[in-house]
Amino acid sequence: MDPNSDFDFTNLAGAAKPATAASGVKPAVAERSKFYNPAVAQKLFELGGSRERMAEGGVFFSENDKHSRGGLFSKAVVNKMFFIAAGEVALTVGGKTLDTIGAGEIFGEMSVITGAPRSATASAKTKCAAYSLDAEQFQNAIQKMPEFALMLMNMMFDRLRLVAARLASRSIAPGHGGERGLSIFDEATLLQLEAELDDAARLRYSSMQVIMHEGKPGAYMYVVLEGRVTISIKGSVVETSGVGGTFGEMALFDQARRTATATAETEVALLAINRNTLLALIAEKPAFAMALLRVVAERLRYMNSLLA
């Protein structure tokens, strides 16, 4: 699987590589995430989605399509994610087949979560029956089925751990890690979080103080209220989180050791959220779940770019 593949979280990054066109061999379908449960996905899409049918050769979406409301000389484009009930879908980049999606699988979720342009074209290899969800339908659906949001996050974190392990084995060129246009919690979400979490959840760190250590167990995720935090793997900075940014959430989901070190670049104020509080927020606040999915998806996209 292409390390920059970011539109099908049922696949593991780097689990399989597509054959070249010259080989004449059908690309292998990548290994599926151990966290993916097709029954949970089907229930969510049936609960909140719309039925779709696509003839053989029909296009679900095209590479570089991006969400737009349309205008006088352009048509509206609404990003949707899909669950395939029957049939097969080919994912192609630059005309080359990357993967094949079959019944029981989902695709197209990255653009719905982040609003980013499509990174591939999805076309029906056979006649397909599917369900679709746009961003509004998706947020409404996870309010009724927060377990799907948890499943999706676990799949993303599974991929992030693979990417982090690959980054740890190589040098990151200076200037490649840093602050970027990451989707962060907006002011309204931050105010809501501060209001709902007690004073004990607020922490302050001095400049250059280590907040969490790579390889150590983790009990909290953090939301930056003031200042900046640098995130590093094996001593190389991979990103910088500013106000509204999050870090440390991965260890709360899989309860594994930290994959990175976080250090206060300036004096910082943080919200510390433990596992039970995090799971409750996801279950009770679909807007929070959607915001966290967006943050994690953007991080996965960015970390993948460091491997390119």
Task: Report the location of each language-model feature.
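Cytosolic regulatory regions built on CNB/CRP/Popeye-like sensor folds
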Residues: 1-308
